[in-house]
Amino acid sequence: MTTAINNNIVNKEFDLKDKTFLASGKTKTIYQLNKEDQYVLIESNSAITAGDGAKKDILPNKDIYSTTTTVNNFKVLQLSGINTHFVKQVEPNAFIAKKCSMIPLEVIVRRLATGSYLKRNTHVTEGTKFNPPLIEFTFKDDVQHDPLVTEQDILEMNLKIGGVPITSKLLSQTRHIATLSFEALERAWQSLDVTLVDFKVEFGITSQGELILADVIDNDSWRIWPKGDKTLMKDKQVYRNLPSALNTPGATPTTQSGPLLNTLSDQQLKMIEDNYAWVATSTEKLVEFTAANLNNNNNNNNNNSNNNNNNTSSTSRSNSLPNVPSITTTPTLHHHHHHHQQQQSGVGNNNNVNSGFQVQLNQPLVGIIMGSQSDWETMKLAANTLTTLGVPFETRIVSAHRTPDRLFEYAKTAKSRGLKIVIAGAGGAAHLPGMVAALTPLPVFGVPVQSKALSGVDSLLSIVQMPAGIPVGTVAIGAAGATNAALLSAAVLAPYYPSIELSLDLYRKKQTDAVAEIPVDNPTSTSTTTTTTTTSNATSILSAIHTSTINSNTSSHNNNQQQQQQQQTILPTQPTIINTPTPVRSSVSRSQSPLPSGNGSSIISQEKTPLSTFVLSTCRPSALVLPPGSTIGILGGGQLARMMAIAAAQLGYKTHIFCPENDPSASHVATYTTKSNYNNYSALDIFARQVDVVTYEFENIMVEPVEYLTKQVAVFPDPKILRTCQDRVLEKTFIQSLDIPTAQFQSVESFNDLKSAIEKIGYPAILKSNTMGYDGKGQVKLTDQVDLEQAWKKVTSETCATKAILEQYIEFESEASVIVARALDGTELTFPLVTNKHRNHILRQTIAPAQLPEYIHKQANEIGLKIARSNGLVGIIAVELFVVKNNETGQYSLMVNELAPRPHNSGHWTIEGCVTSQFEQLIRCVCGLPLGSVDFTKRISEAEFIQQQIPPIVMTNLLGQEVNGWEKILQTKGSHLHIYAKGDAKEGRKMGHVTQQ
């Protein structure tokens, strides 16, 4: 339950003298306010300690610096929509907070690997980035020095705090809120070019049974590195790193039966004090940065500002915020101690985050209307974008010519129903936007829908030519216009709704990052066909989609018939979606706009976030795992997805295939299958709600849909790796940046570029399409006898690419590959190096292990691990290599040819040849499980295999009609046959494989 804290509470004068001592810790004391027993006074002291209090100093003014830092951090979180216990600052070194029963856990959020994490994970390099941030729990127990605990450890304690049991769901909520809090502060610190490395927070339970962020967040709670430089750190770690007290010149330590006191010299004290003062001052700027957009429109809202629910403490700078009725504050009760464990939790020196106000996005703010059913194909892109940004909306067909009464009613009541903006899409005569603008005072954005006759130019001219005094903000024709109308709407709302502002900033940053990496070559239109089936008899369970209602928690006092009709989402018919008789998720009720329940949820209250279905490992304290029984989504339905699904089933996971093909190979073994184009965002929304993690079977999938999924569900490997591997120029540039050799290359964007490039590279050379090439498609070997213009046309036409890459032709001894697995916790392994033989550019045979010198095996492993670490891989990646022999020395060396961030054809032999196959290893990686052994099934290492001269394992692809020899293959001793059930056995098509041991 969320309760507003109004100005009466914020402006209330508390009797600070009438108080009762509750508890004290190393750095603060907590008092019960007797006349306001639902509140406490938290008073900081000037002590600074390290080593669980083993050494202690008194730092001048630390009490003021700590309180200032804490209060400012709470304000940042309030502005970001995160609930905390903070009410107001009442003294330079004290603030009022809501009373709550403290959960005896610290939640640690790590962006970079450093400190104690490195001591426990020696294989991880300092500075390794965790994305998403890594979450750890410690149990508050001074005797045991706050040990690291797993979720299972916590659940076995059977904790019940404030009458609320500590369940797996509640722990998931703490992870989610802690992550949001970290990201809000991280974003604010970035504005000052400071890296927030990690922090720790605590939670409490209010008297209303509500989970809330509590305690303090000061300079003892985090690591911050200005300019990302550890040597410039300003946090408490500087104090921890100072030499032992007895060896400190100028210090006068006291060691009598307790902590080591007065360990610092005057010079050291001054340095630490300066750091704490700098941090306290800097956090003022964090508040300014976070509140900037909220304050931009302050002058336009002075008439409303007296009613603001502003829960920030009083300072010399007034943060007057626009009056938005849906902004409320949630009270958080603090430090109500019932027993020993809770008392300990309330007095620790670790700090918690608080925020006072949260935007309640519980009714539509934007109305999306269109003239007809056919306009939905365009207008749903506006709906998709609003979904991404967390903006609640409604959608309705309102024809200016065929339903004028409906139009009049809709426009006239739009403002009274709480809408702030209307997006109107229409084609042809396109009168809808203008007529709505004439009837409502709300801003109207007009989207010209592309018409068959004049390609939308008629629509554009009809909308844009409005007379003076009746404005319609007109955007581009078609898809771009629909998307931009949604973005403009979000930009208008952002100053009043912090969660929308944050989402919009993240969206813009992602757009910038994408453009900086690589432009999109081949955008395709959204599909209109989606079908979900299973291997059992399928039945429809989503018929409610066609007439669902907005989950709008508006007041029921005026719910007359007209309001009820307007709350109903009357939408164009969605794609047909059939699902399995076994319910996939209970949350399938949703608006036909691809927004859950037609409603943008607040940034705290979302039930599902990308890692919300992961839990802490029961045996590895730092690890997140997805438990068996969960569903793994796989983009693609070919043989790789098929073998992934089989491996997943072996470990107890369900799989859900998403692909556009009819009767895909993987559908025969997967639990669920969705038939849809990859850029059907409505289908992707449903898919994301039905799975717990997503991976993909091939790298030539469109990146944008994969990136879209990351907002709703964890996707591994990261789509950024996908972008790199799809673009050969970007891929080779990345590899060379790691000082790993590749063939010389030149980017080619035109025939003239090709002529210039061949002069630099020389003959012979290989011309390849820059994207989408596979199994020899889109490439030509160039000699001085080849017509360059014809080669250019062939390469670009075969793959519909607009760019190419010209590579130096490498005279290699053989081709090889190494597959690297890297888990969610950063552990990593390489499969044995193999050599590959091709026929007509298609892999024919793989020999494992490669019959090459041991130093080449070592070099391949080093290359693979370097690539995996550098791109933050979670999953598996195959590194295709050229083995080059120096004819003078007889020495071999390796050059990287290509990367594939998925299971690889050259790894199929691992199904029978290794203890853990590449497919099982992928499942382990994306689900956070421990990596499996990559030893041969003979239980010997790669080096032992080579030394004992055991005959290699051979995997042979069955191409085309070769699969018809399946019976003969089965008669061969030591053969393991895999048939992919792919239909027509076309020439060169991979129909199966056989592994011989």
UniProtKB/Swiss-Prot annotation:
GO molecular function per UniProt: ATP binding; metal ion binding; phosphoribosylaminoimidazole carboxylase activity; phosphoribosylaminoimidazolesuccinocarboxamide synthase activity
InterPro entries registered for this protein in UniProt: ATP-grasp, ATP-grasp_carboxylate-amine, ATP_grasp_subdomain_1, PreATP-grasp_dom_sf, PurE_ClassI, PurE_dom, PurK, PurK_C
Alphabetical keyword list: ATP-binding, Decarboxylase, Ligase, Lyase, Magnesium, Manganese, Metal-binding, Multifunctional enzyme, Nucleotide-binding, Purine biosynthesis
Region feature AIR carboxylase, mapped onto this chain: 305-997
Binding-site residues, Mg(2+): 880, 898
Chain positions covered by the region annotation Disordered: 294-355, 518-538, 550-569, 575-604
Listed EC numbers: 6.3.2.6, 4.1.1.21
Pfam family, one: RS_preATP-grasp-like
Keyword Lyase in annotation: yes
GO BP, one annotated term: purine nucleobase metabolic process
Cofactor(s) in the UniProt record: Mg(2+); Mn(2+)
Cellular component terms (Gene Ontology): cytosol
Similarity comment text for this entry: In the N-terminal section; belongs to the SAICAR synthetase family. In the C-terminal section; belongs to the AIR carboxylase family. Class I subfamily.
Function: Bifunctional enzyme involved in de novo IMP synthesis, an essential step for de nove purine synthesis.
Protein name per UniProt: Bifunctional purine synthesis protein purC/E
UniProt source species: Dictyostelium discoideum
Native organism taxonomy: Eukaryota, Amoebozoa, Evosea, Eumycetozoa, Dictyostelia
